Each structure stands twice: as structure tokens, then as C-alpha cells.
């Protein structure tokens, strides 16, 4: 018998789907090479840090090769790129948010989901992009 996922886990996965679509719509191309194929959402602070996982300042599009090579092998260059991309103030705020240790409650996940759905709906309403229809959660 297949085990059903908890509401928390489903909400995290749905937030990931919404966030992925928002980042793809925002960046459109690899932020290092400007290529348009094999794109992946790349996080500066690890995805297991839920405080920054869905922060728009914490992600950009990179090709798979650049993501693996640059972000995971040459971290100092990657960090310099991120600092230049965000500026010192936004970078410091993101770092503070990432290093702040506290549990992420269900209410936090629900609020994040609401905010992501709002951004997603705004993108849909503006007809700027063709968003996939499979991004939906019932809470």
C-alpha cells in the first residue's frame, strides 16, 4: 500500500513547483551564459534551509553544466557573482535570513504558499508567460 505524503510535505513540493515557474518566468535564460536549454533553478543557499528556499533573491536559472561546475566546484566565483547580482545590502539580508536558526512552522509554509500563488497569478494575469496548469494545491 502506497503511503500518502503529509500535508507539510505536499505543501513544500507545491511551493517548489510554484517557485520554479516564477523563477523560469523571471529569468528566461541562463544568468551566466544566456543559453535557453537545459535550464535548472539554482539556489545560492541550500534548499534544505527553508527560510531562504523560496526567496526570489536566493535563486536564478543556470544551465545544468554551469550549475554543477560553477556552483558546486568554484564556490568563491559563484559567491562573487551572487554578491554582484544582489548588491551588498540584499546579499547581507539574505545571508542573515539563511543563518537564522528557527523552526519553520506550518503557518509559515502556508503563508509562503499564499505569497507564491499570488505572484504566480499575477504572472498568469499579465499573460507574459505560458504557465503550466499542473501547479495547484488544495489546502
Give, region by region, the residue ranges found by the protein language model.
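Short Cys/His-rich "knuckle" micro-motifs
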Residues: 38-44, 72-75
Amino acid at each position: 500500500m502506497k503511503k500518502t505524503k503529509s500535508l507539510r510535505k505536499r505543501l513544500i513540493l507545491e511551493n517548489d513547483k510554484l517557485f520554479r515557474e516564477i523563477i523560469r518566468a523571471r529569468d528566461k535564460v541562463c544568468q551566466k551564459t544566456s543559453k535557453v536549454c537545459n535550464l535548472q533553478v539554482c539556489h545560492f543557499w541550500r534548499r534544505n534551509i527553508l527560510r531562504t528556499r523560496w526567496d526570489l533573491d536566493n535563486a536564478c536559472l543556470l544551465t545544468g553544466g554551469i550549475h554543477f561546475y560553477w556552483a558546486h566546484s568554484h564556490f568563491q566565483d559563484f559567491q562573487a557573482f551572487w554578491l554582484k547580482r544582489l548588491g551588498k545590502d540584499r546579499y547581507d539580508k539574505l545571508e542573515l535570513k539563511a543563518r537564522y536558526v528557527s523552526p519553520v512552522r506550518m503557518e509559515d509554509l502556508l503563508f509562503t504558499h499564499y505569497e507564491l500563488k499570488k505572484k504566480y497569478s499575477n504572472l498568469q494575469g499579465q499573460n507574459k508567460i505560458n504557465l503550466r496548469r499542473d501547479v495547484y494545491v488544495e489546502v
